[in-house]
């Protein structure tokens, strides 16, 4: 490649990765799988390592990932808690060893340690007494979790010597404790944790320390900061000293001299992994000498003297029984592989998304094929490859459908998309998905009007579009399966309440392409009414901050449809509000800067007893919070009512602060 080509590829990679990172962490709308991001990130690292003079300040490689969540006091790390570089093969590991030894021009001894799958922590002691504990956070700023760490029996409150030190380690939940916790939660009707790491992370960030104490967490301490001040020269010596002071250290650590010893350690760890009482996801290799560690130093993101060898993902073989196609709300037709059930990473898996026709063609997946299945990110089932050696001779290439599986209309590609779409507005699947979206919690929030009820209403020709929801009668609803008087009355009340929503919910509920809840709010703030928005032109919309031409074109095209205008008239006649009722962001900021909720991203979930969900949302927004409908890594606070369900589970898995209704009401009263 020429220098110009390298510069162009680097620029493109940086732009893509920064955009994807923004979609994931800021907008809550990731557009690519983690595996796609990782592939591009690895390519970026390759090019930058070969061309260090082309590394820019805005490169993703110069950032330490992570986010400090609200709810705990922020703590600055005097010495950054850096992440480790990863390798995934012995060949890559050899390259690391050679690079490190060449940099110091000598053969080195190494410390091999198990990579505990938990949460990184830092502990500080003064004169032998524990005074502070914190999370890694973003590597530079973490959170003070001292009180919760005090509940963990493996952490000594006072050391065997009166030393003033900082140590780092991993907090984890033993496998046995994880099984016991999930068994108890399941028996109590609570959501279970996905894995021990998520359980440990969620337990460590509980506001109630009694809950943390009940979770039987443990720790391994693996590093002593500034060891030279104590005359300690090697990692093995430091581990021995840590143990003598009273810390729990992992006794599987081993000092080695050759790559053969390193590989033997990896092989042993791989064989013993399933039988260990705690989860590991690899091994960590460190230069044994602290003098060498100091000599080679760190990059912005990772130490040059250590590396993590990551185990390959758990993988199983299974057989593809069928390929099903489903139609989504926007008409996208998505293939899914139906497979013989297998156990993968502790759960039974029988289905895996095939994403789009291009993915299906690229993998050449056929009905009857034996495939290798793994969980991307240990969460999402994904077919990694077809086992061609087991493909039968009569196997035929799978034919991508040309007609919608629901209505038979011709499928099309729009704007060079890889996705196939059904664009028939009368497609039953599309209509039902649109109705479900319109009634969903983030849109018009019509409780009780879920997919099962919509299926019946549509099939019985009681509704054909969203306006039809507002014509439903008690006599119609009472005829539905398992629908009694109370259910019918509750649904009619929910429908009636939705008439009074501000238009940002309606805009989002209509399902305009490229218009999510955030964009809907921006449009509502700027245009104030549906009538104004319907007249807006793309060029005008495109000038609004954070929107642009794609959204502008989509909105203008949507309202250019005469059927849409007829629908708006029907909604108006049904008494649905078509005006913006909330405060603009500027008005909110003027009145909310002193609120503890100001600037927080908040999610409401479960049933609230004291006030309506819409009232809670309005109050939060008036006090500077941004209320979103889904939990992500960017969520600051989850307010949980009764029967909180999956959002509470996800919040605990992501270490998001959780507040119950009583705590929320108390805070409201203090700030009102």
Curated annotation (Swiss-Prot):
Residues of the BRCT domain: 592-672
Enzyme Commission code(s) on record: 6.5.1.2
UniProt superkingdom: Bacteria
Annotated organism of origin: Ligilactobacillus salivarius (strain UCC118) (Lactobacillus salivarius)
UniProt entry keywords in alphabetical sequence: DNA damage, DNA repair, DNA replication, Ligase, Magnesium, Manganese, Metal-binding, NAD, Zinc
GO MF assignments: DNA ligase (NAD+) activity; metal ion binding
Official protein name in the record: DNA ligase
Binding site for Zn(2+): 404, 407, 422, 427
Catalytic class of the enzyme: ligase
NCBIfam families: dnlj, PRK07956.1
Cofactor(s) in the UniProt record: Mg(2+); Mn(2+)
Gene name, Swiss-Prot/TrEMBL: ligA
Reaction it catalyzes: NAD(+) + (deoxyribonucleotide)n-3'-hydroxyl + 5'-phospho-(deoxyribonucleotide)m = (deoxyribonucleotide)n+m + AMP + beta-nicotinamide D-nucleotide
Family stated for the protein in its record: Belongs to the NAD-dependent DNA ligase family. LigA subfamily.
GO cellular component: cytosol
């Amino acid at each position: 490649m020429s220098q110009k080509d390298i510069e162009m590829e680097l620029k493109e990679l940086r732009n893509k990765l920064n955009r994807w990172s923004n979609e994931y962490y800021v907008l809550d709308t990731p557009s690519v799988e983690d595996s796609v991001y990782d592939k591009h990130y690895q390519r970026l690292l390759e090019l930058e390592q070969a061309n260090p003079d082309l590394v820019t300040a805005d490169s993703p490689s110069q950032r330490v990932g992570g986010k400090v969540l609200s709810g705990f006091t922020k703590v600055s790390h005097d010495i950054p808690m850096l992440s480790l570089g990863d390798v995934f093969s012995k060949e890559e590991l050899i390259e690391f060893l050679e690079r490190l030894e060449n940099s110091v021009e000598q053969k080195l001894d190494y410390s091999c340690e198990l990579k505990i799958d938990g949460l990184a922590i830092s502990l500080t002691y003064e004169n032998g007494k524990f005074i502070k504990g914190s999370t890694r956070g973003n590597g530079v700023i973490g959170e003070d979790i001292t009180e919760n760490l005090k509940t963990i029996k493996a952490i000594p409150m006072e050391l065997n010597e009166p030393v003033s030190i900082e140590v780092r380690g991993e907090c984890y939940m033993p496998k046995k404790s994880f099984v016991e916790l999930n068994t108890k939660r399941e028996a109590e009707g609570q959501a279970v944790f996905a894995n021990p790491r998520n359980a440990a992370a969620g337990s460590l960030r509980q506001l109630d320390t009694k809950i943390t104490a009940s979770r039987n967490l443990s720790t391994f301490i693996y590093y002593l900061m500034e060891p030279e001040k104590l005359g300690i020269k090697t990692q093995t010596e430091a581990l021995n000293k840590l143990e003598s002071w009273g810390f729990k250290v992992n006794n599987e650590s081993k000092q080695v001299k050759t790559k053969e010893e390193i590989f033997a350690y990896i092989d042993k760890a791989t064989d013993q992994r399933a039988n260990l009482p705690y989860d590991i996801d690899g091994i960590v290799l460190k230069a044994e000498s602290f003098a060498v560690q100091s000599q080679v130093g760190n990059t912005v993101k990772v130490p040059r003297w250590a590396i993590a060898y990551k185990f390959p993902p758990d993988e199983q073989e299974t057989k593809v029984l069928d390929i099903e196609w489903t139609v989504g709300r926007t008409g996208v037709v998505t293939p899914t592989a139906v497979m013989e059930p297998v156990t993968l990473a502790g759960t039974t898996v029988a289905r895996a998304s095939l994403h789009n026709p291009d993915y299906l063609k690229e993998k050449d997946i056929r009905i009857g094929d034996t495939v290798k299945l793994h969980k991307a990110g240990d969460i999402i089932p994904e077919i990694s490859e077809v086992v061609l050696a087991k493909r039968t001779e009569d196997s035929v290439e799978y034919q991508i459908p040309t007609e919608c599986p629901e209505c038979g209309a011709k499928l099309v590609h729009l704007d060079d998309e890889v996705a196939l779409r059904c664009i028939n507005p009368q497609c039953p699947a599309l209509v039902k998905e649109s109705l479900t979206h319109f009634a969903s919690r983030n849109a018009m929030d019509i409780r009780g009007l879920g997919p099962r009820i919509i299926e019946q209403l549509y099939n019985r020709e009681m509704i054909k579009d969203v306006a039809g929801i507002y014509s439903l009668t008690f006599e119609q609803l009472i005829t539905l399966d398992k629908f009694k008087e109370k259910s019918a009355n509750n649904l009619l009340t929910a429908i009636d309440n939705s008439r009074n929503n501000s238009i940002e919910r309606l805009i989002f509920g209509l399902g305009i392409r490229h218009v999510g809840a955030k964009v809907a709010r921006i449009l509502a703030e700027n245009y104030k009414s549906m009538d104004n928005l319907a007249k807006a032109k793309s060029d005008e919309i495109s000038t609004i901050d954070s929107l642009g031409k794609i959204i502008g074109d989509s909105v203008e095209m949507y309202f250019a449809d005469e059927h849409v205008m007829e629908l708006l008239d029907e909604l108006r006649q049904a008494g649905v509000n078509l005006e913006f009722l909330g405060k603009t962001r500027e008005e909110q900021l003027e009145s909310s800067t002193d609120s503890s909720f100001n600037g927080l991203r908040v999610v409401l979930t479960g049933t609230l007893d004291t006030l309506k969900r819409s009232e809670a949302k309005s109050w939060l927004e008036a006090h500077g919070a941004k209320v979103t409908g889904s939990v992500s890594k960017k969520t600051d606070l989850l307010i949980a009512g009764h029967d909180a369900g999956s959002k509470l589970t996800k919040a605990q898995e992501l270490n998001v602060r959780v507040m119950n209704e009583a705590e929320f009401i108390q805070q409201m009263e203090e700030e009102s």
